[in-house]
Curated annotation (Swiss-Prot):
Domain Enoyl reductase (ER), residue spans: 19-363
Species in which this protein is naturally found: Aspergillus niger (strain ATCC MYA-4892 / CBS 513.88 / FGSC A1513)
Organism placement in taxonomy: Eukaryota, Fungi, Dikarya, Ascomycota, Pezizomycotina
EC number, as in UniProt: 1.-.-.-
Family membership: Belongs to the zinc-containing alcohol dehydrogenase family.
Function: Trans-enoyl reductase; part of the gene cluster that produces the acyltetronic acid derivatives carlosic acid, agglomerin F and carlosic acid methyl ether. The PKS domains of caaA condenses two malonyl-CoAs into an acetyl starter unit, and form 1,3-diketohexanyl-ACP with the help of the trans-enoyl reductase caaB. Next, the C domain of caaA forms the ester bond between the acyl chain and L-malic acid (derived from the TCA cycle) and accepted by the A domain instead of an amino acid.
Binding site for NADP(+): Y219
Induction notes from the record: Expression is positively regulated by the cluster-specific transcription factor caaR.
Protein name: Trans-enoyl reductase caaB
Length: 366
């Protein structure tokens, strides 16, 4: 007999922002309405990201549900959702948590209203806890590499053979290669047939190599940029900065080859550094939230108008990554599964705020 249609309540347990740095557990938060393009997901696990603490501290939205990364089971589908999805599918993705325009949507809740064309079906071999680590890092890396750096999106090419005289397009630098976004970027680049090189601390060299880095450099080394230039034979034309620090901007600019290229980071960059190579390096910074194709109602330079092109790109990226997941080609960033349920999630946001997490992602079964 077919399974019964899940009963969806009108209220749920969720973690809601109350003010700057303040979250509380509500047991009467509204379950988001089912929109035509939405997959409503019963949450099984959530992951903590640095942005969870950052946005809460600097751009809180009182009354809004927080959280970005989730995994769970589809319990309802809107009228305009991809035909390959069905109720009962195990999926993962990310949402714009603590969104002033959609305050009922956030990952830290029993039910998540996710953009259906941006969710990934999990293979049977991947747990919810592992799947919860995919979303934000994956889409941030993809947006940076294939939209901002303008590397062609093709995750089905065979890796290029080692060449004694690499072409301009061979090498891509990932600064912060051991971060969740960095490991995603390294893996996507390797699958795209490119030659990723990375910077991170020596303690995480093996992690970066595991995800595809051809060479890894210690970003603490004062000669790091020169070493990268030497390794890439002064041809490096692409740099993705996952740390978004003044020092890493300087490092990336120093590592790019003589002809210059493109630099993209995850935060506003230092104009003084960018001015050092104004005619040869094109800098930009990305906000992963544009991938939903909706207006991003944040203050100052973080606010963005709706960008339908990023939404279309996100759907294409999802489709290609889904194929890789189905083939077992996607490895997951190391996760540390924590206990405590929703209370544990509150504590996890504070752990990330205090920068005590390195080389793995905190994940909570809920």
């Amino acid at each position: 007999m077919p399974s019964a249609t899940p009963v969806i309540p009108s209220q749920q347990t969720a973690i809601v922002a109350e003010g700057a740095g303040q979250l509380s557990i509500y047991h009467d938060a509204p379950v988001p309405a089912l929109q035509p393009d939405v997959a409503l997901v019963k949450t099984a696990a959530v992951a903590i990201n640095p942005v969870d603490a950052k946005m809460l501290d600097y751009s809180p939205v009182p009354g809004a549900i927080h959280g970005y990364d989730f995994a769970g089971t589809i319990v309802a589908l809107g009228s305009d959702t991809p035909p390959h999805l069905k109720v009962g599918d195990r999926v993962a993705g990310f949402v714009h948590g603590m969104n002033p325009l959609l305050p009922d949507v956030g990952a830290f809740a029993e039910y998540v209203a996710a953009s259906a064309d941006l969710v990934l079906k999990l293979p049977d071999t991947m747990s919810f806890e592992e799947g919860a680590s995919l979303g934000l890092g994956l889409f941030t890396a993809g947006l940076g590499l294939f939209q901002h750096l303008q590397i062609p999106l093709s995750l089905t090419r065979e890796p290029s053979p080692e060449a004694s005289s690499p072409t301009k397009a061979d090498f891509v630098l990932v600064a912060g290669g051991s971060t969740a976004t960095g490991t995603r970027a390294l893996q996507l680049l390797k699958l795209a047939g490119l030659r990723p090189v990375a910077t991170c601390s020596p303690a995480h060299f093996d992690l970066a190599r595991r995800f595809g880095a051809e060479a890894v450099f210690d970003y603490h080394d004062p000669d790091c940029a020169a070493a990268i230039r030497a390794y890439t034979k002064n041809t490096l034309a692409y740099a993705l900065d996952c740390l978004a620090l003044a020092e890493t901007t300087q490092l990336c600019y120093g590592a790019l080859g003589r002809a210059g290229g493109r630099y993209v980071t995850l935060e506003p960059f230092r104009e003084a550094i960018a001015a050092q190579r104004p005619h040869t390096v094109t800098p930009s910074w990305l906000l992963a939230l544009t991938i939903f194709g909706r207006k991003v109602a944040l203050d100052g330079e973080y606010g963005r108008e709706a960008n339908p092109e990023d939404r279309e790109f996100g759907a294409r990226l999802t489709e290609q990554v889904q194929g890789l997941l189905d083939e077992g080609k996607v490895d997951v960033h190391p996760v540390r599964v924590m206990g405590g349920g929703w209370q544990g999630v509150l504590e996890g946001v504070d752990l990330v705020r205090r920068q005590t997490v390195s080389g793995h992602k905190l994940v909570y079964a809920v």
